[in-house]
Curated annotation (Swiss-Prot):
Protein name per its UniProtKB record: D-erythrose-4-phosphate dehydrogenase
Keyword field: Cytoplasm, NAD, Oxidoreductase, Pyridoxine biosynthesis
EC number: 1.2.1.72
Site location (Activates thiol group during catalysis): 182
Reaction(s) catalysed (UniProt annotation): D-erythrose 4-phosphate + NAD(+) + H2O = 4-phospho-D-erythronate + NADH + 2 H(+)
Lineage summary: Bacteria, Pseudomonadati, Pseudomonadota, Gammaproteobacteria, Enterobacterales
Binding site residues for substrate: 154-156, 200, 213-214, 236
Organism listed in the record: Salmonella paratyphi A (strain AKU_12601)
Primary gene name: epd
GO terms, biological process: glucose metabolic process; pyridoxal phosphate biosynthetic process; pyridoxine biosynthetic process
Compartments reported by the entry: Cytoplasm
Record flagged with keyword Oxidoreductase: yes
Pathway(s) of this molecule: Cofactor biosynthesis; pyridoxine 5'-phosphate biosynthesis; pyridoxine 5'-phosphate from D-erythrose 4-phosphate: step 1/5
Family membership: Belongs to the glyceraldehyde-3-phosphate dehydrogenase family. Epd subfamily.
Length: 348
């Protein structure tokens, strides 16, 4: 059975979801029936075909009136501003992937369902009243049929949660701090211009810019036992893609850096294959562009101080890895209702 999805919002994540679907060979499992985007069809087709970060799309892309053609597939284009007016019932939509970054609470999800969708997956953390928040590879098995409105968390949460779980299971985490070194985003300015956050009034290409982050809250949403035991900060750097996360944790059991690396490498080759990767190559951020993993542990940067303080550096393609997890979570949500096999949904 094929899951019929619609995408609401065809920005960075929405377009990468479509690209990831075609590149990963999952079109027998998922089909895109519609995309709702306020921009015109010509712009949608052009930005799907040509991408500064990820290169030229291998599939033929064209548009005719309000239809987008990807290879031989036809996707209906919509330009609805009001969720209630979306024709999800008419189109037989199983799961809406809301990638606007604007909508994200239970009321918004209910609006999609009232329009005829069976389930909704938000591409950001959303509000605390959602039915579930999923970090694929860690807690997707907790999904139930009654979880209709779900968050896929954030790219940085998907990056760091698997590593935190591995370290906690092995050594017992007492507390931790996280620094997200994040590529620039479209809420920043090309040149100095007004913004409610005065730091984000400054040109993104010229400065390292501290920004607010809810990453610590994202960690405790998945692992409530860490409430008040993690803190996080974030800076934006003048690159257009790929993020590094500096994770420091104090642990109960004494450990050596070599043992930490052995643990993480084994997980990447085993239980977390396809979600976590491990490298000791002398790589830089651009080398992780278009990497489908949620997290890539840089073993050359692992440090242990006093046997109980662990520092790790974890990379992720904050667009491509997250887009692949959107597809994984979509299949996991569908599997609950439609008894699809989502166990092998992660394909590299």
């Amino acid at each position: 059975m094929t899951v019929r999805i619609a995408i609401n919002g065809f920005g960075r994540i929405g377009r990468n979801v479509v690209r990831a679907l075609y590149e990963s060979g999952r079109r027998a499992e998922i089909t895109v029936v519609a995309i709702n985007e306020l921009a015109d069809a010509a712009g949608m087709a052009h930005l799907l075909k040509y991408d500064t970060s990820h290169g030229r799309f291998a599939w033929e892309v064209r548009h005719e009136r309000e239809q987008l053609f990807v290879g031989d597939d036809v996707i209906r284009i919509l330009h609805e501003r009001t969720l209630a007016d979306l024709p999800w019932r008419e189109l037989g939509v199983d799961v809406v992937l809301d990638c606007t970054g604007v909508y994200g609470n239970q009321e918004h999800g209910e609006a999609h369902i009232a329009a005829g969708a069976k389930k909704v997956l938000f591409s950001h953390p959303g509000s605390n009243d959602l039915d579930a928040t999923v970090v694929f590879g860690v807690n997707q098995n907790q999904l139930r049929a009654e979880h209709r409105i779900v968050s896929n968390a954030s790219c940085t949460t998907n990056c760091i949660i698997p590593v935190i779980k591995l370290l906690d299971d092995a050594y017992g985490i007492e507390s931790g701090t996280v620094t997200a070194i994040h590529s620039a985003m479209n809420d920043q300015q090309v040149i100095d211009a007004y913004h409610s956050d005065l730091r984000r009034t400054r040109a993104a290409s010229q400065s390292i810019i501290p920004v607010d982050t809810k990453l610590a809250a994202g960690i405790t949403r998945i692992f409530p036992q860490f409430n008040d035991r993690f803190e996080a900060i974030a800076v934006r750097v003048p690159t257009i893609n790929v993020t590094a996360i500096d994770l420091s944790v104090t642990v109960k059991k004494p450990v050596k850096a070599s043992e930490v690396n052995q643990l993480l490498q084994k997980a990447a080759q085993g239980a977390f294959h396809g979600i976590v990767d491990y490298t000791e190559s002398p790589l830089v951020s651009i080398d992780f562009n278009h990497d489908p993993h949620s997290a890539i542990v840089d073993g050359t940067q692992t440090r242990v101080s006093g046997a109980h303080l662990i520092k790790t550096l974890v990379w992720c393609d904050n667009e491509w890895g997250f887009a692949n997890r959107m597809l994984d979570t979509t299949l996991a949500m569908a599997a609950v209702d439609f008894r699809l096999d989502a166990s092998a949904s992660t394909k590299l």
